A protein has these predicted regions:
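Nucleotide-sugar donor-binding and catalytic loop/hinge architecture
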Residues: 175-179
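Carbohydrate-associated surface elements
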Residues: 150, 171
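Short beta-strand scaffold positions
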Residues: 54, 145-147
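Generic beta-sheet signal
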Residues: 2, 79-80, 147, 168
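Short N-terminal targeting/anchoring amphipathic segment
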Residues: 42-61, 74-79
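Membrane-proximal helix-turn-helix segments that form the acceptor-binding/catalytic region
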Residues: 38, 42, 71, 84, ...
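A short helix->loop->beta-strand "cap" motif at the edges of active sites that frequently abuts
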Residues: 72-76, 141, 162-163
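A conserved catalytic-core segment of Leloir-type glycosyltransferases
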Residues: 1-51, 92
Length: 179
């Protein structure tokens, strides 16, 4: 879809590329945010927002957008939809079992091949977690919105400050639930 806002979009890349150049490009986006910075800076400069609200930014965008907003003095609110910030493979599951090993040491994603049961994918997930770590993300983000108290508690367990975690539950109207 072509629209006026295209000039702000991140460069499109394939995360399922088979060739070496494509794989390097995808890894560079995931670990360093390559292909995002210039256009997002332009967006911040031209739009001058008071707040940036982030959702599902890993891979296609990158946590670099939180850093860029922070550097310009723009407040950053980040709604969480998974456990990516404390578990490099997103789910707190390892081979079907609950796992919290990465809360304190991200190397477990590699040792257990948690990402797609693949050593290379797990190394990439580890690199991403090491670069976009809780110290940086907590500094750049004013508030993380958690859809449940459980998630907020897990985020705290993973080292995120309670003062930055807000619980706003997802819900539907009671009249929409059939018992």
């Amino acid at each position: 879809i072509v629209c006026e806002e295209n000039k702000y979009f991140a460069e499109e890349i394939s995360f399922s590329a088979k060739d070496l150049q494509g794989k390097i490009k995808a890894a560079s986006r995931i670990i360093w945010g390559i292909g995002v910075v210039q256009n997002f800076k332009k967006l911040l400069e031209e739009f001058q927002p008071d707040v940036v609200h982030l959702n599902n930014i890993h891979s296609y965008l990158s946590p670099i957008v939180a850093k860029l907003a922070y550097q310009r003095g723009v407040k950053v609110i980040w709604t969480l939809h998974d456990y990516k910030l404390i578990c490099p493979s997103y789910s707190c599951l390892c081979k079907g079992n609950t796992c919290e090993a990465c809360f304190t040491d991200k190397k477990h994603v590699v040792l257990r091949k948690c990402m797609k049961n693949s050593f290379p994918a797990s190394i990439l997930a580890w690199g991403e977690a090491m670069n976009w770590n809780k110290n940086k993300l907590s500094l750049w983000t004013n508030s993380f919105i958690c859809p449940s108290q459980f998630m907020a508690e897990k985020m705290q367990q993973g080292g995120y400050p309670a003062s930055k975690l807000q619980v706003i539950s997802n819900f539907i109207g009671e009249e929409q639930v059939q018992y």
